[in-house]
Regions:
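A ligand-binding cleft/hinge motif common to bilobed small-molecule-binding domains
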Residues: 176-184
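Residue-level recognition of oxygen-bearing side chains
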Residues: 84, 158, 174-177
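Small-residue-centered hinge/linker elements
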Residues: 1-40, 49, 55-141, 185-195
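Short acidic-hydrophobic, aromatic-tinged amphipathic segments that line or gate anion-handling sites
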Residues: 64-67, 169-177
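Secondary-structure end/capping motifs
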Residues: 134-162
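Glycine-rich beta-to-alpha transition loops that act as phosphate-gripper elements at the mouths
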Residues: 44-51, 152-156
């Protein structure tokens, strides 16, 4: 939908109404890039939580408004939730066995190591890769230096006042303020063309 709105000649920008704790990492980088490279302003209106995957793509917005001191922003981190149903199936007397050809011995290796050996080394390697991308993106979009020891890059969330003071969001405002900001950008763009 965002691509269609950006392409529409009568739409001057987009306001994202954000209240989300994050979620799946899949394609959040693609959404972030779309927002960052948009020729029209895309603004976030945060009301509640803007964490993890939501924080990832919102960091690319041209402006980030918060609605309340209770808004939470941040959680630059990743998590992998592993669920094993092996014991449950055993209790139900259901036997499940996976077979792999010798030529695909690396298939599902991270999952298998965790399940069979309680070794999450490969999972953590993958998570480190994702977290590095996430942290570098946040640093670039917020214009801050990446520091692995900074709580911002270690998964901490911040209430709105702190996030505002640190530059992670831009201003307090209402949904109407966000809409007016987008509309004003079109006026500024037109005025700059006239000068």
């Amino acid at each position: 939908y965002i691509s269609a709105e950006i392409a529409h000649e009568r739409i001057s920008g987009v306001v994202l109404f954000v209240n989300g704790p994050g979620g799946m990492i899949t394609r959040v980088d693609v959404l972030e890039k779309l927002i960052r490279q948009s020729p029209k302003p895309i603004v976030a209106y945060i009301t509640g939580v803007c964490a993890s995957a939501h924080f990832w793509f919102v960091s690319a917005c041209a402006r980030r408004f918060v609605s309340s001191p209770m808004d939470e922003i941040g959680s630059c981190g990743v998590v992998y939730t592993f669920q094993s149903f092996k014991e449950y199936y055993a209790q139900m007397r259901i036997e499940i066995e996976d077979s792999y050809p010798d030529s695909a011995d690396r298939k599902n290796r991270a999952y298998r190591d965790n399940e069979e050996k309680q070794d999450d080394t490969l999972i953590k390697e993958n998570l480190s890769f994702y977290h590095h991308l996430f942290a570098q993106t946040i640093a670039r979009n917020l214009g801050v230096k990446y520091d692995a020891q900074d709580p911002l890059f270690r998964g901490q969330t911040f209430f709105a006042d702190t996030a505002l003071a640190k530059g992670y969001v831009d201003a307090y405002g209402s949904l109407e303020d966000a809409i007016l900001w987008v509309a004003a950008q079109k006026t500024v763009k037109r005025a700059n063309k006239m000068i």
